[in-house]
Regions:
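Phosphate/nucleotide-binding beta-alpha loop and adjacent structural elements of enzyme active sites
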Residues: 1-240
Length: 240
């Protein structure tokens, strides 16, 4: 596993009063510890975002929902040409700056949204209850991005603001592969996922679907109970 001795975990190194049940050890643990352990396992041990497609030398990578930078940190030894990291949380962004002070990393303190405006949100780590939002199309234009080799997405429901009519030409023709977490935890997200699945997902050449524990669930993607059963899934998409 990659050496993490110099990696700054920010708020995740500070004990939180809030706890969460960890099924692996069958007891409640502090939220910061749970979140840190989950990230280490997902990104540095299981490498969930690179299970099927991998970042290669010279790639242009976009990391949407960069947090404190674990995914980008995990791929830097592959020498990507450029990594664009978006993170809306002000507290996590400060740590992101500490972890990724590299010439081939572009850090952006924004989150993907339906509009270029300030967005109220309950899903930001830290004390923030709003963030600076940007449309995916605006992000592409503002950063002069012509092509993305590897698009990684984990933005707490913001993924549905990426897969929109205005972005589909770019996503289908100017992105090599897309890997991310799709959230179905609320009723509104379940509605959005169904729309995304039935209208946009079928337009891509190759699609693989995994549960959060790595099980292949593509076979049941269009089953009646899929959307009701799952709260979160990992989708791997390729245009190649």
């Amino acid at each position: 596993m990659k050496d993490l001795s110099n990696f700054d975990w920010g708020w995740m190194n500070k004990l939180t009063k809030e706890t969460i049940y960890d099924p692996n050890i069958e007891k409640d643990i502090p939220l910061n510890e749970y979140h840190k352990n989950s990230i280490i396992n997902e990104i540095f041990v299981e490498k969930i975002y690179e299970k099927i497609y991998q970042v290669k030398e010279g790639d242009v990578v976009v990391d949407i929902g960069a947090s404190v930078g674990p995914f980008t940190y995990s791929i830097l030894d592959k020498n990507p040409k450029m990594v664009h990291c978006l993170e809306p949380s002000n507290s996590e962004y400060k740590t992101l700056i500490t972890n990724l002070p590299f010439d081939n990393v572009n850090l952006i303190n924004k989150g993907i949204s339906h509009s270029d405006s300030i967005v109220n949100s309950d899903f930001i780590f830290g004390d923030d209850d709003e963030f600076d939002g940007t449309k995916f199309s605006s992000f592409i234009k503002d950063n002069y991005i012509k092509y993305i080799d590897f698009l990684k997405i984990d933005c707490e429901g913001g993924e549905y603001h990426i897969f929109m009519d205005e972005n589909m030409d770019f996503l289908l023709n100017k992105v090599g592969c897309i890997v991310g977490e799709w959230h179905l935890g609320t009723e509104s997200e379940k509605v959005e996922f169904k729309y995304f699945r039935d209208k946009y997902l079928k337009q891509f050449k190759t699609v693989e679907v995994r549960s959060v524990d790595g099980v292949d669930i593509k076979w049941e993607l269009y089953k009646d109970n899929f959307i009701e059963y799952y709260n979160q899934v990992i989708i791997h998409i390729s245009n190649k």
